[in-house]
Amino acid sequence: MIVRSAHPSDRPNLASLLYYEQTVYRHLDWRPLLDWLGKSPFGVIEENDAIQAALACPSDPPEIAWIRLFAVDSGISPQMAWKELWRFVLDQFSQEQRPVQVGAIALNGWFQGLLEESDFKQQNEVVVLIWKVAHIRHEISGSFFKIRRMTEKDLPVVAQVDHLAFPSPWQLSENSIKAGHEQAAMATVAESEDGIVGYQISTALNDSAHLARLAVLPAYQNRGIGAALVKALQVDCDRRGLRSLTVNTQADNLASLHLYSKLNFHLTGERYPLYLFEMIP
């Protein structure tokens, strides 16, 4: 058994592992899992020229390294694979000689157990809300801003808005926002005479939509911009004939929960623990 860094040439074997195996953890992300090939740390266990397990958690942005994937072949123990690959990842990070947070959202029980055994600490929970699409006529107006469609040229500024609007570990890199924009069904910005002050990116599948990202510059918060972006999205969902709109937020983000409650979103009862591991050189 060999534990080593993944190489671009591993793509076919990794694709098979992700497709055929059931013990697979995927981070909630816009970027395809195999796009992380070539980034570090991304470790694999290889035996007899076959990849038995993989663990990837490159830093992006630099302050946070989300666990992007953990996949295990049915022929080996998830606990053993995790132990070997997590040791490999820790060694990779220790060589960088800088502090970093490693984050993971526990989407299933078996993965949550592995995190807790490795001294990850629960910091928060992600909760899910839903709005059942109804015919509505929102008054969408702002005395100092307008809402328009997001363009590719907006992405650098949108990334700056995101970085200022969210604390670590919730910030997104420009590359992640670009990937989100490419997959978006509906993406808009709120623009004042000072420039872009807020944005939203949403995806759609079949008859459902998901508000994947909503951000407003701190100096412009509590001025109706976030509500206007969501209202415009609700109108668009109705126009498209969609049946539901979901959104995730943190359990302790009271301002966000209050906003969605005012706009007739309701908690679904789904909750996913957020775990962090502090790497201090």
Predicted features and spans:
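Conserved active-site alpha-helix within GNAT-family acetyltransferase domains
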Residues: A106-N124, R223, A227, A251-G269
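Conserved donor-binding loop and adjoining core beta-sheet/short helix segment
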Residues: Y19, D29-R87, D91-F93, Q200-A212, ...
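A short beta-loop-alpha structural element at the N-terminal edge
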Residues: M1-L14, F145-V158, T268
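C-terminal "cap" of GNAT-fold acetyltransferases
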Residues: V127-F145, T151, N248-L254, H266, ...
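Acyl-donor-binding surface of acyltransferase catalytic domains
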Residues: D73-S143, P273-L276
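Active-site rim helix/loop that mediates acceptor-substrate recognition in acyltransferases
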Residues: L18-E47, A56, A165-V197, I201
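Conserved acetyl-CoA-binding loop-helix of GNAT-fold acetyltransferases
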Residues: P78-D91, V216, N222-V235, R239, ...
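Conserved hydrophobic beta-strand within the GNAT/NAT acetyltransferase core sheet
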Residues: V100-I105, L211, L245-T249
